[in-house]
Amino acid sequence: METKLTTVGVIGGGQLAWMMAQEAPRLGLKLAVQTPGESDPAVALADKVVLTAIADGEGTRELAEHCGVITFENEFVDLPSLEKLAQQGITFHPRLDALAPLLDKWEQRHFLQNLGLPVPDFWALESLPAQLPDFPWVLKARRHGYDGQGTQIINSPADLPDLSKAPPGSWMVESFVPYERELAVIGVRNARGEMEIYPVVETKQIDQVCRWVVAPAPIDAAIAATAQDYCRRILNHLDYVGILAIEFFLLPASTQTPTPEQRLLVNELAPRTHNSGHFSLDACHTSQFALQLQAVTGQTLGSSALRCGQAVMVNLLGYEVSTGDYQQQLDKLAALPHSHVHWYGKGDCRPGRKLGHVTLLNPDVESEPSTAWAEDLVKQVEAIWYPD
């Protein structure tokens, strides 16, 4: 088989593509990446690198010369440029018409509503109702927001930033959801309609950045089943090929929210691998990165099932401006029982930047999911990683 047919192109070269590049050889595949920086993590492992901006259509055309299919590490792409390339026979997975309703958060919310899935109340910033919704609000950039960037909690009119120079249609407002937990689920589908759905996980955010993830989430089985069902519905409706992550709000149980369907709100979709799925590298039979590659190349999908009782993934976030390698801390983390450390090799550290992660496993497959178990390990990891 020609090398081009066994090479997957990835738009993006960060840590998600880096982890894909680690999995590719095990599947008999090569990886080519389109990324702007020579020091981006995936550059060191990719078989071919196109150094250009993520949204550069000509760069994507060059990428396509080296691969049989192109997939995505992030959603910061220029869809019209890609559509021109698709018309010339370049294959993208997910397909561009499946991506189209997901890239803009406003359009994504309407897509979910039309599918009959519950979402928080939301409005375009330019068309707020005459009777303003109660504070607090969540102000969101409709595109290019991630890790808390492009999201702001608005507690009063005084908190509103000056957006007078913002292009129309670039911001939206939604009601703040007083949730009990934040959950996530990742699903994968290939062109034959075969699917794998990972266990539902709980995510812990601090300052709107994910700090840790516990899998499976310690929640009622009916709630987990509902979240996974929503994932299947979205994948099938879009005739999706690739990987999709869904973030949820779980509302507190009450007389107003007695059923799983009433307690779950869909927050956001991400048409790519996701931070909430990093645990799968060490805790599942097949990682999210391997499943994405299998799906977009038409391979049989591996199992997404856990091969341990429980796992907790802790992000290693930057807390200073530095170029250090943090080897002493990494060695201590690696010495923790059933620990797996992943260091992304980024050239510089700054506060809040995701530099790596560590996953810790409970090998007892008969154990019940426990928040206390996860929180104890998170404390151990963060005591090692962060200075006093």
Swiss-Prot record:
Q: Which domain of life is it from?
A: Bacteria
Q: What is its EC number?
A: 6.3.4.18
Which Pfam family would be a valid example here?
Answer: RS_preATP-grasp-like
Locate the residues binding ATP. Answer: 105, 140, 174-177, 182, 267-268
GO terms (molecular function) for this protein are: 5-(carboxyamino)imidazole ribonucleotide synthase activity; ATP binding; metal ion binding; phosphoribosylaminoimidazole carboxylase activity
Q: Which pathway is this protein assigned to?
A: Purine metabolism; IMP biosynthesis via de novo pathway; 5-amino-1-(5-phospho-D-ribosyl)imidazole-4-carboxylate from 5-amino-1-(5-phospho-D-ribosyl)imidazole (N5-CAIR route): step 1/2
Q: Which GO terms describe its cellular component?
A: cytosol
Ranges for domain ATP-grasp come to 109-297
Q: How does it assemble?
A: Homodimer.
This chain's function reads: Catalyzes the ATP-dependent conversion of 5-aminoimidazole ribonucleotide (AIR) and HCO(3)(-) to N5-carboxyaminoimidazole ribonucleotide (N5-CAIR).
Name of the molecule in the record: N5-carboxyaminoimidazole ribonucleotide synthase
Organism per entry: Synechocystis sp. (strain ATCC 27184 / PCC 6803 / Kazusa)
